[in-house]
Amino acid sequence: EELRALAEVEEELNERWPETKIEPSLERIEMLMDLLGHPERSFDVIHIAGTNGKSSTARMVDSLLRAFHRRVGLVTSPHLQRVTERIGIDGQPIHPRDYVRIWHEIKPFVEMVDAQSDVPMSKFEVLVGLSYAAFADAPVDVAVVEVGLGGRWDATNVVNADVSVITPVGLDHTDYLGDTLAEIAGEKAGIIKPREDADDPLTPNENIVVIAEQDPEAMRVILQQAVDVEAGVARSGSEFAALESRIAVGGQQVNIQGLGGLYEDIFLPLHGEHQAKNAAVALAAVEAFFGASAGHPLDVATVRNGFAQAISPGRLERVRTSPTTFIDAAHNPHGAKALGAALDRDFDFARLIGVLSIFADKDATGI
């Protein structure tokens, strides 16, 4: 009964603009948030943009925050099997019953926005609204929010984040975001904003942006945005770094230089050196969120526990043995290169067969 109701809601939402069709405006989602009483202001936010590594980084941040006994909401996209995967609460997908209930609660307000807009709300905009309403309903302490596409005009960007994260920027979605790394980085950096309550003596006077390793062209644009809005900056390779990654059964052992100090012998149940780098970014984001600084690290045992529980479905995920079978969501050359390097480093297959399915708008030759 619950799954049938979920399917009916999904069918209803599929009649809206598809997620790949975006308009450079936050007007509709802002109107919905206003009508709902601003649920997006009821929790702290770590906001994550970038081309590759967003979902894995978001899931690691989520796992770390829960290890520190925070109630966490998680927004990721797209889903692999069921739409409820996109909205996580306390480490679990939202229950279909709650998904359907909250949709029916916000539906009249969505229809009010539709009536006042030139075009109706897109499916993605509605899902973002549903996510933020679900987090306020739960309620959660902090939301880890993965950008859907770009950053500046992404519907998730109605939040004012405590910590913004930019994972590696590469060429993807060039028809929407621009043809150069600088243009794409400019769109991603749109999530870096000045702190709304900077004059409040009880809050930090700046937001923090955590930046993964970047091509110099992209890094210049991201840093300029941080300077323009007076955000604090933590860069991979400067303020923090993945120092060492050793192959281990079921994943890898990682040493990370964090913002607060050295975190050694961390077991990460994910494969590939790129995931060690994602882990360093995730840890820096959580350190920034809690205010860790040089000489004042987070509790190492809790950090180890958080990373040990991390999962990232569809990212070099082993789904069977005999024969060993992995699935991976790489869909651009940068992601495919990381996948190839991980297979080469972490495994020793005598024979490897790749089965690829690539959308027409992707760089199939590069992949």
Where are these regions (language model features)?
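N-terminal leader/targeting and accessory segments in enzymes
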Residues: E1-N52, S56-R71, L80-Q81, P139, ...
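Acidic, Mg2+-coordinating active-site environments of NTP-dependent enzymes
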Residues: V113-A115, P139-E146, A161-D265, A279, ...
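Active-site catalytic microenvironments for nucleophilic, acid-base chemistry
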Residues: L35, L64-F68, A134, A285-A292, ...
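ATP-dependent carboxylate-amine ligase catalytic core
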Residues: T20-I22, L26, E30-R41, A67-V159, ...
